[in-house]
């Protein structure tokens, strides 16, 4: 039986999580809350998407609900998470995708409305973080609020895990060349905490900070303190790429590195870590449901212990698919607890 889910925040990730949920089979979205989008506008925003294209099915309103392919979804417009009637709507698990309620204390407010568990679709300062294919075994049913980490951590961690398990990572630096996101400005505007981040997104390559590499140490404890990184925001709408430079404990040829990544992509990390030897560019990964796709032809070894590895990710679609996978996993664990 499909897990009943509510979505708080119908922005980029909220909408793409819903698209993924409709494809997933194990996830049944029964309610959406967004105080800034009325029902008619919700239909429009879900139906038309500049990046992923028009939704192929029928989207309409009926009796105050959002109806997709004949399936009714309750819609609320509460600003206070504690006031959202998740329980009444039948939502056991809530995807917190506003980007605002990212701590345990704030995300826990959803529990007051009847939700049983909250999955934050962003990194969290204090909630346990999980990355599919990396540390799901650490999940405990008593957790009420968990985080799906960031899209970049979801790309980096599976790759780092394979390399670390096979050759050992002494240390590493990561750069993510990252597509534009909703927090950026179309033209120069005020951004008091991040001056560079306030510059026009369409006109610039913008250096930015990211905690994605350090967060790998939270999901792979043996890598704690061994990785850090930065981001370049670039003028594309979606798809990003991780550039990971690592020093290895155990020497390996680039062919050996490719071999273990390919094996993992066909085995224990199938569907999460992909592998390609094609001459690909970013748009080739639009709509990719994998967390990370290793680009075998783009990497460069300097010697047998120092190597640059490249991996692509659809920072919207692939990440949203993992949100659905994480919910399906924890729901199964919760039922068997």
From Swiss-Prot:
The active site is at residue 151. The keyword Transit peptide does not apply. Pathway: Carbohydrate degradation; glycolysis; pyruvate from D-glyceraldehyde 3-phosphate: step 1/5. This is Glyceraldehyde-3-phosphate dehydrogenase. CDD domains: GAPDH_I_C, GAPDH_I_N. GO terms for biological process: glucose metabolic process; glycolytic process. The record marks 178 as: Activates thiol group during catalysis. It is an enzyme of class 1 (oxidoreductase). D-glyceraldehyde 3-phosphate binds at residues 150-152, 181, 210-211, 233. GO terms for cellular component: cytosol. Its EC number is 1.2.1.12. GO terms for molecular function: glyceraldehyde-3-phosphate dehydrogenase (NAD+) (phosphorylating) activity; NAD binding; NADP binding. Homotetramer. Belongs to the glyceraldehyde-3-phosphate dehydrogenase family. It catalyses: D-glyceraldehyde 3-phosphate + phosphate + NAD(+) = (2R)-3-phospho-glyceroyl phosphate + NADH + H(+). Pfam families: Gp_dh_C (PF02800), Gp_dh_N (PF00044).
